[in-house]
Amino acid sequence: LFSYGGIRFATALCGDLWTPGKPEELAALGADAVLWPVWCDYPAAEWNEQVKLEYAAQASRCGCPVLYVNPFCVDPAAPDAAAGGAACFSGGRIVCEAPAGESGILFVEL
């Protein structure tokens, strides 16, 4: 747990939120938000159409907004290339997002 700008953050790495009990453990910390850097190699279309909804549902178990960020590989033909994307998940919803398959910056106000 750390604070920045008066906001208390917890951090989850990649598959942490899929580990049984980990989302609830993070919720018990009482953070204002969870930072969730990942490496997801789903094809961009698959992420944008369906998978992000599963991640939003899983993130809701943390009990606070979850800030998801996935790196953007410039060579999409590379094996296991990450397609980028970022989102703010809260309450099982996608509050805002930068779609996978595009480079960009997502600004989120907490």
Predicted regions and their residues:
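Short acidic-hydrophobic surface loop/beta-edge motif
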Residues: 1-4
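Active-site-proximal beta-strand elements of phosphoester/diester hydrolases
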Residues: 7-16, 35
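CN hydrolase (nitrilase-like) catalytic-core segments centered on the catalytic cysteine
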Residues: 18-105
